[in-house]
């Protein structure tokens, strides 16, 4: 996506679609927009992990930030690149490696496992997540070396195989709010018996908002 001029008038209110760059937090986008526009009331309609890229629906002005929950409830779509044969503690590329395997699943095995990731399923959130349990965020406990029992959450997903050439598995995933793509990758690895983690993640859609409609932030000094 090419960079485009960010609206600057302080009275601007509305929705701004950004393509989040890799390595940046969702709050980074909020802070940059606040600085560029002078508007303090800026939020978003769903966070992305730092390693992920893609659609960020930025809500500018009080009339839109107060609608955050409505936008957050939208279904999402992702292109996930999953590396097989390696398991990390965070289920993604930023985590520490905790297991390795030389097993190379066949395409038939991949197809069979993916049938478990269609429709309504129960999903256990990863320890490295912002989900709260007993008043604490799970990632805070994980950083202390703790692992606690997590309540499974019901989500609805549709998984499409895009490409498979060991060790790289590429999937398109449509899902409801609160679905952890990292958990899908981890669970696939467990079912295949080889381990897996998300090595690249692109959010391609958030509700009606598509990646091709997003702009990139201008370079920051």
Where are these regions (language model features)?
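Catalytic/RNA-binding core of pseudouridine synthases
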Residues: 1-221
């Amino acid at each position: 996506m090419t960079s485009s001029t960010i609206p600057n008038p302080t009275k601007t209110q509305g929705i701004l679609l950004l393509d989040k760059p890799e390595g940046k937090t969702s709050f980074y986008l909020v802070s940059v927009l606040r600085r560029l526009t002078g508007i303090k009331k800026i939020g978003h309609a769903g966070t992305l992990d730092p390693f992920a890229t893609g659609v960020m629906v930025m809500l500018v002005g009080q009339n839109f930030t107060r609608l955050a929950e409505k936008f957050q409830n939208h279904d999402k779509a992702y292109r996930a690149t999953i590396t097989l044969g390696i398991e990390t503690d965070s289920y993604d590329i930023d985590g520490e490696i905790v297991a390795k395997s030389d097993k190379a699943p066949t395409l038939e095995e991949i197809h069979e496992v993916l049938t478990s990731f269609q429709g309504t399923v129960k999903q256990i959130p990863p320890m490295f997540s912002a989900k709260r349990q007993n008043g604490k965020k799970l990632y805070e406990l994980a950083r202390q070396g703790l692992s606690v029992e997590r309540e499974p959450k019901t989500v609805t997903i549709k998984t499409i195989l895009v490409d498979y050439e060991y060790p790289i598995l590429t999937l398109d995933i449509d899902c409801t709010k609160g679905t952890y793509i990292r958990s899908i990758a981890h669970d696939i690895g467990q079912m295949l018996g080889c381990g897996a983690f998300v090595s690249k993640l692109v959010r391609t859609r958030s509700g009606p908002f598509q990646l091709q409609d997003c702009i990139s932030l201008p370079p920051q000094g």
